[in-house]
């Protein structure tokens, strides 16, 4: 399934900056606040330590680097674009973790209180970096991410319909989309059937003469009525073994009746989904709802709800149980 969902913070990077995404998410609010506090402690302590004695230049670079990392994480969360940039975020955080831990090692053993305070700020930055790497580096379907995201207000809304642009060839055949050819028996055709095999030519079978075509359809002026010797008897046509051999098989016969769909799998909705009103095949479901699934090979799964409603659902909204 195309995995760019607003639910995971994947609005394609085009969402506007909204502080409500941070305020409404306790995890993001707490970690960004701790990271900002740790950076301020390290920055102020570094200035004081640099006045009294020499300060490692490497730690200044670590401070500048982590400043932009915190800004980047804040922007990604506020713009609801975490899923779009989560790979880059994990990479930058991993490099920042190396910088902050190295700064801690170069400052923590000094007797100067300012340098020790700066080391404490870098320790806070290192701890937040580890938490962010574990969170942003995990799949949205991970249990710890689902637990954390359940406290966020904005992550309970229905995502954008970008996932509906999936290739329709992956959609399973349903009763709404499948179209069966209409079949008629000889009694319904009432003389309009032909004994020649149908080849797709508008005049009937290839090589058919004009006389044969004229016998099937009366010429104009006769009102479309058949004479007594031209109109076949429907009962005789049905009882004739030759006509039974030629007439197409009716859809109501047991051999062509569509077998009921089986649902051997069970899936849990990790997020709510609202069906497209223009597509009668889709179904809506709520977060944590249990669905029965018949096929899990494509991007769209044939699913059945507890109330008996059936339809297709995007696979990236479901997780198999």
Curated annotation (Swiss-Prot):
GO terms for cellular component: plasma membrane. Gene3D superfamilies: SH3 Domains. Plasma membrane osmosensor that activates the high osmolarity glycerol (HOG) MAPK signaling pathway in response to high osmolarity. This is High osmolarity signaling protein SHO1A. Residues 155-181, 194-261 are annotated as: Disordered. Forms homooligomers. It holds the Pfam family SH3_1.
């Amino acid at each position: 399934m195309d995995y760019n969902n607003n639910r995971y913070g994947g609005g394609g990077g085009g969402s506007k900056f909204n502080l409500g995404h941070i305020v409404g998410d306790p995890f993001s609010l707490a970690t960004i606040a701790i990271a900002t506090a740790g950076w301020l402690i390290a920055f102020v302590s570094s200035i004081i330590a640099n006045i009294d004695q020499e300060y490692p230049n490497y730690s200044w670079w670590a401070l500048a680097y982590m400043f932009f990392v915190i800004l980047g994480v804040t922007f990604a969360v506020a713009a609801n674009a975490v899923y779009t940039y989560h790979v880059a975020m994990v990479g930058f955080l991993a490099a920042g973790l190396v910088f902050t831990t190295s700064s801690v090692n170069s400052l923590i053993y000094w007797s100067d209180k300012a340098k020790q305070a700066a080391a404490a700020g870098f320790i806070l930055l290192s701890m937040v970096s580890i938490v962010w790497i574990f969170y942003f580096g995990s799949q949205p379907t991970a249990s710890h991410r689902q637990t954390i995201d359940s406290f966020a207000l904005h992550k309970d809304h229905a995502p954008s319909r970008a996932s509906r642009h999936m290739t329709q060839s992956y959609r399973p055949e349903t009763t709404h989309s499948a179209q069966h050819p209409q079949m008629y028996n000889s009694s319904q055709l009432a003389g309009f059937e032909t004994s020649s095999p149908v080849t797709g030519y508008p005049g009937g079978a290839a090589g058919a003469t004009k006389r044969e075509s004229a016998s099937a359809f009366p010429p104009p002026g006769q009102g479309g009525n058949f004479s007594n010797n031209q109109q076949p008897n429907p009962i005789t046509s049905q009882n004739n073994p030759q006509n039974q051999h030629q007439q197409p098989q009716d859809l109501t016969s047991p051999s062509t009746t569509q077998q009921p769909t089986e649902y051997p799998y069970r899936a849990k909705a990790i997020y709510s989904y609202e069906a497209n009103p223009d597509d009668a095949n889709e179904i809506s479901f709520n977060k944590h709802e249990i669905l029965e699934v018949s096929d899990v090979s494509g991007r769209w799964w044939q699913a059945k709800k507890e109330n008996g409603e059936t339809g297709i659902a995007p696979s990236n909204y479901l997780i198999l149980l």
